[in-house]
Amino acid sequence: MMNRFRKWLYKPKRSDPQLLAQFYYADEELNQVATELDSLDGRKDPQRCTLLVNQFRSCQDNVLNIINQIMDECIPEERANRDFCVKFPEEIRHDNLAGQLWFGAECLAAGSIIMNREIESMAMRPLAKDLTRSLEEVRNITRDQALRDLNHYTERIKEALRHFDGLFAEFELSYVSAMVPVKSPKEYYIQQEVIVLFCETVERALKLEYLTQDMIDDYEPALMFTIPRLAIVCGLVIYSEGPLNLDRKPEDMSELFRPFRTLLRKIRDLLQTLTEEELMTLERSLCISQDGEFPTSSTNDPSASTGPDSQTEELEKEKGVEEVVDLTLFVTQEDSVWKEEEEKQVLPESSSESEEEEPIDADLACSMQYDEEEIEQLNMMVHQVGDEMSTLLSPPSQNQSPAHRPRPYNGSSLEGSSATSSTQASPRRAPGSYHDDDRVFFMDDLESGLSSELCRGQLPLPTVCLRSPEGSSCNGWLTVCQSSDATNLGCQRKLSQSTESVGNSDRMVNGWEGLQDEDSVQTAEEIANRTGGMKLSATVIFNPHSPSLSDLAVVLPQSADAPEGGEGGALVATQCLLNSCVCCAGGCVDNHEDAMEPAGRSMALGFEKHKLTITSSVIQSAVAAGSPGKGNGHLPLTLPPSQGHLTHSVPNCSVQNQAREDEGSQDGIHYPCCEKCSPGVLLAQDRGSGHEGGPSCTLQDTGCQTQHNASVKGRSECFGKQSKDDNRKINSSSQESPLSSVPSSDIDGVSVTTCSLSSSYAPSPVSSLTTSSDMSEDLDHQEIQVALQAAKLAAHNKIRSRFHSSSDLIHRLFVCISGVADQLQTNYASDLRSILKTLFEVMATKTDQGDNEKPKKGPCLGSAVLEDCALCQETISSSELAAKAREGQFEDPPEWVPDEACNSCIACKAPFTVIRRKHHCRSCGKIFCSRCSSHSAPLPRYGQMKPVRVCTHCYMFHVTPFYSDRTGI
């Protein structure tokens, strides 16, 4: 009774702008529609029921909007946190989301279950009941206050609003998370990094004129494909520490690129071998949407015409950019890259099967496919291309895959073919299998790492020639040039010694093929143990029984009368281990031969990752590189400086055995020695060795007598006896000083003491080479640089040797990068669309927006009003429109804007093109693009009872904002 009097006395006017008055009439309208809907039988009049349901949801949304404004005015500092809303997909972030949540809460509270979300529905039902009760309480309290004082909010209202706001925020997160995937805070942050990468990519593309600002402002459709492609290149090469940093853990990567992690590693390694010109060519190609426009003209490989001097200049440029990293980490990471997934696929052996797969590879070259069959092929592209591409980027495996086992071929010898042919560029290819060259990729299983390949001799190595110091040194270090001697690529290489006193024992190893004695196979670790447990400066492991060991040879100074022989496996392995200069206490390792008279002589250097450690006194490193071939991207390799063709002997050697001294001091012997230790160099003089004319050195005699005419076998046996005595000495010796033993080996003898950086023999005043710790650190740093550069050269040459030319490499990169980028359009369309939308907002030309830039605090009725919208200017209520529809009083539909009068979308201003077509809204008659008019709803005021196309604005504010035949409740 009191409420009736209060309503009669204090009922607010409909025109009152105060929020409590607006809420009163909005709540009244909602109750009227709810009452009519309850009394209606939906089976008898389904169309009427549909209209009432849509009107009911519209009224709910109106009530919630007003409550939201009341909370902003009543409890502005006590609102619930809604930062999680930024993680919601763009499709559901609109002003009428609150009404949908209310409708969902009522359905759940009444016992309904969300389709395919039974568990989530059961979990949310208690929260939904609490929310509906709280909302009813807020409505009753606010309605009662509207009949009292419109300018005052009681404490009871504030408390009810706080409780409702917290429950509503909790239900919003739970309900939306159950319906659509919602990112975690970490995933959202990673996506923000991807957006930054895309923006940086576009900014760089604008500077390099790959793109134009007009294309950004006009929302060019081709940019949806171009920008992700360029972003992959920039993320792997330019901004390598960003979200595409492949050194991160997989869970730290964006979910967009995580499935392509292995393939991205391969792409990154290929991109790092490109020159600046090749990279620009690739990026320009990625900006072309039609594959037919890809440049197919074969260009000469820039590396083919790049001389040692220009390579040195390029290296100096790279030094200014790249940090010198720890060599152990570098090699470990390089090896780990090649081990991941190469066992997953093996190409068929028969050429007919390979030829059948060629059309598939040809189809992969297309970056955009629209019919169903090609889309299916595109979905398979990432895995297929990734597997096939592994061979291009990976070193050969320890066990050859069936596709690359040696095949019989007639009349084709390696020596008879061109030294620069593509089949010789990679010794892994069988000379008769030329059809492999036409394939997109080859496949090798990556069972083992690069060190195992060195053991088996299956890794091609670069031709290194040492030249005279004049005009060929770089900061005192010799450079590497490609040997012009084509015979270095042959199967047979010679190993000879220049010792005159033991000429009868000289041996020549022809391709290592004659070494079949199992006992002659010696690893570096075994030799280290036999020589007293010393840490060798160069760890090289050879397997003389490898069938392809002809590609791995050590060329030493050769005497004219060196006879050939089939023995000496242990000798060869030991010679390789001793083939380094260890004259400096700080660890100066020279991985080159110093007495190579022919300029075309090559030297093979290798490393084993398990033995590769870097300390202040020990560096066990060597170089693995690819054989020169067509398409190689040669990088300069700097080796420790040499005095050219050194012929200096070591006069100041203190020995305990005269026979050993006679052998070690002959004029014809050339000791591996670096520039820092050779006579006449200031650095050697500053070491305070106490001797002039050359470095001090000491031969540690162990009681093993060596005869001048002893055979190699006898020397090996003597060498084995010596190791026992050495081991006894090691156990009792002191290791207080990291003094180095100078190598004094005869080139043909293995019984002499090996060179070492961390010898455990007792220090001798005569053999000590003292130096400061600073000098040692400097030398270590230089050696790390040398080994790092050598390893990079090896990896780059290995990769480039598998391609015919530069254009071939660029085209295959184009295929792979386009495949990954275009796959994002299918697998992650929503995320990519959100990223590109933010990108266009940031990179588009800024215009003066005035008051439109003011952020909205929340859903607001005023924000829905458009000045040029006739429907927004109407004052008629939705209930009046419903009454007219019931009476059959239909209005005339609005006039359509002529097609020629509009060239861009009314909403997003995107220009219309052949792809972006014009669409009229049936509610307002204006022209929109397909994205801005993607909704359908009935228009009862115009007599349209079936859903028709309407724009987003009309759908949200003027017709049936919640109509959808895809409702999940």
From Swiss-Prot:
A zinc finger (FYVE-type) spans 899-959. Monoubiquitination at Lys-87 prevents binding to phosphatidylinositol 3-phosphate (PI3P) and localization to early endosome membranes. The keyword Acyltransferase does not apply. Keywords: Cytoplasm, Endosome, Isopeptide bond, Membrane, Metal-binding, Ubl conjugation, Zinc, Zinc-finger. PROSITE patterns: ZF_FYVE (PS50178). Zn(2+) 1 binds at residues 905, 908, 929, 932. One of its GO terms (molecular function) is phosphatidylinositol-3-phosphate binding. It is found in: Cytoplasm, Cytosol; Early endosome membrane. PANTHER family: LATERAL SIGNALING TARGET PROTEIN 2 HOMOLOG (PTHR46465:SF2). Its main location: cytoplasm. There is a cross-link at residue 87 (Glycyl lysine isopeptide (Lys-Gly) (interchain with G-Cter in ubiquitin)). Residues 336-346, 715-729 have a biased composition (Basic and acidic residues). The FYVE-type zinc finger mediates the interaction with phosphatidylinositol 3-phosphate (PI3P) and localization to early endosome membranes when not monoubiquitinated at Lys-87. CDD domains: FYVE_LST2 (cd15731). Belongs to the lst-2 family. One of its GO terms (cellular component) is cytosol. The keyword Zinc-finger applies. This is Lateral signaling target protein 2 homolog. Residues 295-310, 391-402 have a biased composition (Polar residues). SUPFAM superfamilies: FYVE/PHD zinc finger.
